[in-house]
Curated annotation (Swiss-Prot):
First-tier enzyme category under EC: hydrolase
A GO MF label: hydrolase activity
Pfam families listed in its UniProt record: Exo_endo_phos
Free-text function comment from the UniProt entry: Catalyzes the dephosphorylation of intracellular maltose 6'-P formed during PTS-catalyzed maltose transport, leading to the formation of maltose. MapP connects PTS-mediated maltose uptake to maltose phosphorylase-catalyzed metabolism. Is also able to efficiently dephosphorylate turanose 6'-P, and to a much lesser extent, leucrose 6'-P and maltulose 6'-P. Cannot use glucose 6-P, fructose 6-P and sucrose 6-P as substrates.
Cited PANTHER family: ENDONUCLEASE_EXONUCLEASE_PHOSPHATASE FAMILY PROTEIN, TRAF AND TNF RECEPTOR-ASSOCIATED PROTEIN
CDD domains: RgfB-like
Cited InterPro entries: Endo/exonu/phosph_ase_sf (IPR036691), Endo/exonuclease/phosphatase (IPR005135), TDP2-like (IPR051547)
Organism of provenance: Enterococcus faecalis (strain TX4000 / JH2-2)
Catalytic reaction list: alpha-maltose 6'-phosphate + H2O = D-maltose + phosphate
Name of the protein in its database record: Maltose 6'-phosphate phosphatase
Disulfide bonds, paired cysteine numbers: none
Deletion consequences: Cells lacking this gene grow significantly and reproducibly faster than the wild-type strain on glucose as carbon source. They are able to transport maltose and grow in maltose-containing medium, although at significantly slower rate than the wild-type strain. They seem to accumulate primarily maltose 6'-P when exposed to a maltose-containing growth medium.
Protein encoded by which gene: mapP
Length: 274
């Protein structure tokens, strides 16, 4: 079973449709079963897609309408044209750059029962610090799972920012019974206080990079990007946390310009499980 995650920075890159296609090609070639996407954008002013046309879409109870330029919607359409059908969910987190409805997406080979969990102190959709995390239950080759696609805030204090958001998510996930897969952009580099909150969580999860039998690459950001304007280091801020009982065969950084082209200001991860 393979997992894939990437912060897509969608519609903000040069040649965005080419980059969308590159993401879809790797999903196909890797035969990934579950995919988590962050910074999945659609324009506020673009045309809505009628719900009846979204045949494999799994909405949340308070679903934001899907628009025809929704980046995840277009990826799913591309995959379907190639004969691979994915169920998917998406929900807006906040308005980005004044023109986009920005959110998180999940794709699965099986139907998703999804919800968006507000984890930030801010609740205003126009505030880029408002964070909603997409949480879903789905079947997989490893049984029923709870999967998360998340894009979190930066570290501020032990009571605000990332720390506050992680506490909200942690409390919510602790009520569940299924094995947990948490994928996404934590905005907290490995080894820092924010990362240690997750590493030391009472949730039964482990960092795929740490436990993998084989690793190819490590960092997922290697330059100055939005939110890391002063960065000059290679950072590991995108993660895959998997159930403690799972065996990780390989952790691979993708979309980094080596075997696969750069498609975003973040690199992606491909996790191969035994």
């Amino acid at each position: 079973m393979n997992l894939l995650t990437i912060n897509t920075h969608s519609w903000l890159e040069e040649e965005p449709l080419k980059k969308l296609e590159e993401i879809a090609k790797v999903i196909l070639s890797s035969e990934s079963e579950i995919i988590a996407l962050q910074e999945v954008n659609q324009k506020v002013a673009s045309k809505k897609v009628p719900l009846e046309q979204l045949t494999t879409f799994c909405p949340i109870a308070t679903q934001t309408p899907i628009h025809e330029d929704n980046f995840a919607y277009l990826i799913v359409q591309y995959l379907a044209e190639k004969g691979q059908h994915y169920y998917w969910s998406w929900e807006m987190s906040h308005i980005g750059y004044a023109i986009y409805e920005e959110g998180n997406a999940l794709l699965s080979k099986c139907p998703l029962t999804s919800e968006a969990l507000l984890i930030s102190e801010s609740q205003e959709p126009t505030n880029y610090r408002t964070r909603k995390i997409l949480v879903a239950e789905t079947e997989s080759s490893k049984g029923t799972l709870t999967v998360v696609s998340g894009h979190f805030s930066w570290w501020e204090t032990p009571c605000t920012g990332f720390a506050y958001e992680w506490l909200q998510l942690e409390k919510y996930l602790a009520m569940g019974q299924q094995p947990l897969v948490i994928l996404g952009d934590l905005n907290n580099p490995a080894g820092t206080t924010g990362y240690q909150l997750v590493e030391n969580s009472y949730l039964p999860i482990q960092d795929a990079f740490v436990v993998a039998e084989e690793t190819s690459g490590e960092a997922t950001v290697e330059k100055k990007i939005d939110g890391w304007e002063e960065n000059e280091a290679a950072l590991r801020i995108d993660y895959a946390f998997v159930p403690k009982q799972w065996h990780v065969r390989k952790y691979e950084v993708i979309f980094d310009g080596r075997k696969t082209p750069i498609v975003s200001d973040h690199f992606g991860l491909l996790i191969q499980l035994k």
